[in-house]
Every structure is written in C-alpha cells, then in structure tokens.
C-alpha cells in the first residue's frame, strides 16, 4: 500500500491524503502490515500493529481483527455490513472507535455477478470460483455458496493459500479448468488485482468466460467485471483518516454504505470467445473496451 503502487486504489488513497496535507515522509508516517505478518497468527499481528501507537488504522481485514485493534486505536475500516459484523451500533452514528465504508459482499452481489455472467454465457452450468482459502472459509465463502445455490449453479471452488503468489493463482485456474467447469469467477482478494496480467493470461488459456471483481482485469484482457467503486471508497477512507487525525472521534463519523456499482466489459475478449453481449448488458455497461 504505497503512493506509487500498481494498485490504482492505493494511489487514489494517498493522492487524497496528500491533497488534504498528509504527505508520507513529511507530515505522515505509515506502517504497513499484510499477509506477510499473519504467519504467527492474529495475536502477533495485533501486537505488531498497536506497539507503535498509531493515531489511526486503515483496515481491510476480518471483523475479529478490526474489533481487537479498535479497543486501542481508532479504525477506518473497509468492510461488509458493519452492523451484522458487530463493528458499530448504526451507520449514522457508529458510536465506538470504528468508522469506514460498507460494501455488500454478500449473496446479492455474488448473485448479480452470476446473473450477468449467465446473461453473457447462457450455457453456464458449473462455475469455477477462484479465491483465497481464508475467504472461502469465512463470510465471503458462505455468501458465494448461498448465491450459487439460489442461482441453480454448481460451484467448483479452486482455493489459493495465503500469502498467494502469481503462480498459485495461475495453477489454480488452469488445474480447475482441466477437471470441469465451463465458466470462471475470480474472488475479491486484492492479490488478484496485483497479479492481474498473469491471471488474465491463465484464464485465456482455458478458453472459458470469466467474471472478475476489478475493472483493471477487464482492461488487461478479461471478459467482464462487476463491483462497487473502489476508487470512491478509498477517497472516502482518506477523508475519514484526515478527520480523525484532525481530532474527530470515529464514532461521530457516519459509516458510508456503497450504493454505486460498475459493470465493465471487453468486446475484443468476447469476440475471441465467440460471445455476443446481449443488449441488456451493453445498455448498462459503465465501461466498454473495444
């Protein structure tokens, strides 16, 4: 998570912080923690995060971790439903030490992705789902299973262990396509964005249609993506971080609920797969790559 990251959402975050006067190395110090620090488990990660007594934590993490660190440090979280997860009392007045942005990562969002993929490829019956094992074993996996069942789609999970590498993703995609499935869906993990070029190439080798989370994978040659506006969410994260650094209590900052979703499609990739997007998809696409 750096300002010159290949991840466009992190660039937006730091650009907005800079615009508000928080410049890393000058007026802002940033400690970074991720999959690499999870080797010894959640307690050791918690200890590492809070030992330097940060003024605020930006967390894209499990609810248990967010709750634990919030007992000590104000948190801006990018999460699912914070009320259902027990993070806050209400969206309008969180009331505790946590605020942030809520995104629907439940059955409705996954169901919409399945629906759109089926509109593009009506023959879809068996869906290969590629994501981190940790996500599959948690709320995301439950939501995906629920969505697939409601859509009458057989789900074939192909799971990648954390920390995931580019090779892990490519192997999971290619090997799962060999054993069955006639369409692919990539999960919401940021690591899929980091390895987007290799992932798109691996999917292309399978000659199967695929639904992605991030539009950047469609720009890299993927077929289609449907998700919330992550650039907007990271701008809002920077706004919340700025407010907390200037003295506002997180419990007084409303928890934002994302309502904007974007559909991206790649006509060149569709043509290569022999797919013609129906008017129902063409008419609602926010981004069309030709």
Annotate the PLM regions.
Residues 1-290:
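Short hydrophobic alpha-helices and adjacent helix-cap/hinge residues
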């Amino acid at each position: 998570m750096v300002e010159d990251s290949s991840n466009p959402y992190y660039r937006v975050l730091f650009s907005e912080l800079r615009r508000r006067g928080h410049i890393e190395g000058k007026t802002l110090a940033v400690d970074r923690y991720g999959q690499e620090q999870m080797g010894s488990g959640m307690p050791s990660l918690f200890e590492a995060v809070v030992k330097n007594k940060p003024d605020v934590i930006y967390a894209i993490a499990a609810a248990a971790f967010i709750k634990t660190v919030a007992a000590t440090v104000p948190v801006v979280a990018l999460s699912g439903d914070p009320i259902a997860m027990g993070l806050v009392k209400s969206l309008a007045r969180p009331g505790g030490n946590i605020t942030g942005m809520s995104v629907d990562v439940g059955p409705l969002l996954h169901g919409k992705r399945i629906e759109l993929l089926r509109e593009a490829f009506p023959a879809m019956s068996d869906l290969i789902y590629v994501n981190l094992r940790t996500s599959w074993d948690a709320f995301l996996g439950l939501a995906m299973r629920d969505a697939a069942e409601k859509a009458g789609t057989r789900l074939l999970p192909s799971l990648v262990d954390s920390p995931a590498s580019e090779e892990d993703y490519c192997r999971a995609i290619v090997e799962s396509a060999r054993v069955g499935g006639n369409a692919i869906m990539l999960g919401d993990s940021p690591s899929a964005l980091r390895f987007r070029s290799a992932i798109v190439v691996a999917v292309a080798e399978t000659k199967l249609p695929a639904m992605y989370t991030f539009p950047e994978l469609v720009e890299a040659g993927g077929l289609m993506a449907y998700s919330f506006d992550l650039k907007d969410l990271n701008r809002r994260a920077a706004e919340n971080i700025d407010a907390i650094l200037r003295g506002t209590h997180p419990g007084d900052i409303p928890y934002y609920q994302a309502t904007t979703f974007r559909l991206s499609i790649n006509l060149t990739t569709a043509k290569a797969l022999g797919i013609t997007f129906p008017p129902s998809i063409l008419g609602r696409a926010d981004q069309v790559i030709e």
